[in-house]
Amino acid sequence: MRFVVTLFVSLCSALTAHAGQSAALERGTAIIDPLALRELDHGRLGLSGIFRPAGSSGAEITGSQLFALPAMAPVRRALDDEYDRYIARHTSSLPNESIGVGTAFDFQLFDRALLYSNDTRFVLAGIVNRMDRSYLSEANCGEIRLIYRLARMGAPEIGENAVSPRLPMTLNVVLKAKGDHEIDSNGAAITCAAIARRWLAAGDLAVTGTELAEKLVSKDGPLDLIKPENIDRIETNLQIAHAPKSAIRDFRTDYLMKVFNYNAKAQIFEQAPLENQIDRERILADEDLKRDFKTWLLDPTHFGELDRGTILIPDKFLATVAVAPTPVGFTSSDLQPAFGLVQGDGATADPVFKESDVVAALKKAADAGLTLQNIRSPAGFERRLNDVTCSGCHQTRGIGGFHFPGVDWMAAKPSNSTVVPASPHFFGDQVRRRDILTTLRDGTQPDFSRGFSSRPQSRGSTELAGTAYEDGWGALCYQQKPDAADNDISFRSWTCAEGLACQAVDKASRMGMCFVKGR
């Protein structure tokens, strides 16, 4: 595990050094300019402008004020309950390792009092277009996500080596890209094509800071269409605890994830299942649920959706909380959400899916005329089962447990920040997302499919070739066997760029990273 952590730090350092080169990848699909985000945060896209608490008059909303809102009462209760359950589970499973707030403990809890403090608030860290998810609701044209990062208020401007006031929690406000309004402020129809056109045009703007912010919220800008009434849900991601390396364990951090749907009629946020977060413990403990899940998922239609990454698993199989430990490394373990569901993990004598079940499903899909892109072997099925979950995706090529920690515009020189705003997975997926935006703008049918979280689809091979996002130094790869026929068909294309070789980290799966040959 120590080797994996060292590799991850080195990879993040390499990405930082090339942040300027990779900046173009998010053009038209995300807003990460720190100076523009600072202006937007101080305007109507600050969290107070989105939640509009009575009497706020556009002022900053503190953590205590936010969680005192009636709409947020269920969120606070749910987070407090999860804290208590997390501590109880830890005390039961690891009685010899202390847990609490502060460095004196083996597992150091995030101080939940900071959530409800007058001295903290959520600041706008980034804005992400997710119209690539419009297959879930064509009428709403997908989603726009406002990502906020918890931070201490009143902290002095930080220098290059000072500690940032930002804290390890994000609050993601997910809005419908298209709400109920049919006409924009210019009198034109609001369509998916029109929204996509605005975003792609914004990606061509060669300005920054205040000027960029003004153009983004102008009548023709993509952010003019963002309205509080379009809120669909909020998603929270909190580093609930971290354990420094010790004599008995490697470094570990746990991230707690929750989702709360907005009930417009009741005007409150209600706890909801996490999308595709398979409830492993509940399924393995219930024979009827296990049978139903197996039957549902191996149906050729659903199997094909799983392969394409467009599946939506029914709520009855899902959990309402996810804890994502990081780093998980390359070896299959119970830290991964789908561990024990597929034969071979070693976690259970009676898995949900035997290898013969997957082989039969592959044949059935082929007989039905389905061309599978990713799941072409039992190992491919197992990997996909992990990475469609919230926690499994966040464990893959993330920055800790985050995919979008955001730009630190509180830094002394935010335009030259040395902090990478998003994960390798995020940047590696931007070509696919922009391709979908382009097809939506042009009125053609998008290809909503996506590759594994570990490796982008080949549709970005030209733009991503030679980078750490695909086959460059530090990219994830599959070490080829001497006889090509013995290679796993799901991963045999995961090779390295010229001059690099795949160094396997996990000998069983042959998964590794691309490094200079001979090293």
List each model region and its residues.
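Primarily the internal scaffold of c-type cytochrome electron-transfer domains
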Residues: 397-446
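Bacterial N-terminal signal peptides
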Residues: 5-14
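Short, flexible, mixed-charge glycine/proline-rich loop motifs
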Residues: 378-385
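Sec/Tat signal peptide C-region and signal peptidase I cleavage site
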Residues: 15-19
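Secreted, cysteine-rich disulfide-bonded mini-domains of extracellular proteins
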Residues: 458-519
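Conserved small-residue
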Residues: 20-361, 426, 431, 435-465, ...
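Short, charged low-complexity linear segments at domain edges
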Residues: 352-376, 468-481
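The canonical Cys-X-X-Cys-His
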Residues: 387-397
